[in-house]
């Protein structure tokens, strides 16, 4: 999440305070876990009174909403870069995988895992994560459609399946980045790129012979 993409001098005071609080919330959530982090801890981390904090964010859920909004902006920028890339779509996606997934700082990945865990307990947070997941899958479907139209992906690849598979695969990478102290992005890159190439080549697909979920 790029909290500081706008130069400090250009931000209005309210926006500067909002960024300051969200950065503090990130640190507190990563260090203590979302569930154990209190509003007072975030206020202390931000160096302000609890009253000032509540005036900007009335709850932890509101902070998560702010973080999710920033995440959506970053996602939109990332996909815009991919679609505007002058290289072949496969090469653009390869670079995007390196930049936005494998190079994810561990603390950012841990924040994602904390939010996902809270989504299992908190319906409001769950709704936010579902909205982002749906947006990511929709954008991936468009990207895969573009790859198929250009010949960079197999016409056999179902775009909806491809998007769902890729989201699931990336979530696993984020979990490993968050929890494995010795995670080495460079060592993992050949595997990740190989999976992406296999997906676009149509080598990965649902099992057509799998029984229905309700079958005995």
Predicted segment positions?
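Short, solvent-exposed amphipathic helices
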Residues: 107, 128-135, 139-142
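Hydrophobic/aromatic-rich alpha-helical bundle segments in the mid-to-C-terminal region
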Residues: 126-130, 148-196, 203-216
């Amino acid at each position: 999440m790029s909290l500081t993409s706008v130069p400090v001098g250009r931000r209005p005071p309210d926006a500067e305070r909002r960024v300051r609080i969200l950065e503090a919330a990130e640190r507190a959530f990563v260090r203590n876990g979302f569930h154990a982090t209190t509003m007072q801890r975030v206020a202390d981390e931000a160096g302000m009174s609890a009253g000032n904090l509540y005036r900007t964010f009335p709850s932890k859920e509101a902070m998560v909403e702010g973080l999710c909004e920033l995440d959506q902006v970053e996602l939109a920028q990332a996909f815009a870069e991919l679609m505007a890339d002058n290289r072949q779509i496969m090469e653009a996606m390869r670079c995007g995988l390196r930049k936005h997934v494998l190079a994810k700082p561990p603390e950012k990945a841990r924040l994602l895992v904390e939010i996902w865990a809270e989504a299992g307990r908190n319906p409001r947070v769950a709704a936010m994560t579902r909205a982002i997941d749906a947006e990511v899958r929709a954008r991936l479907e468009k990207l895969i459609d573009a790859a198929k139209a250009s010949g960079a992906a197999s016409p056999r690849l179902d775009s909806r399946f491809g998007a769902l598979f890729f989201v699931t695969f990336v979530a696993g990478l984020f979990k490993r980045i968050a929890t494995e102290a010795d995670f080495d992005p460079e060592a993992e890159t050949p595997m990740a790129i190989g999976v992406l190439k296999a997906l676009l080549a149509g080598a990965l697909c649902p099992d057509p012979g799998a029984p229905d979920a309700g079958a005995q």
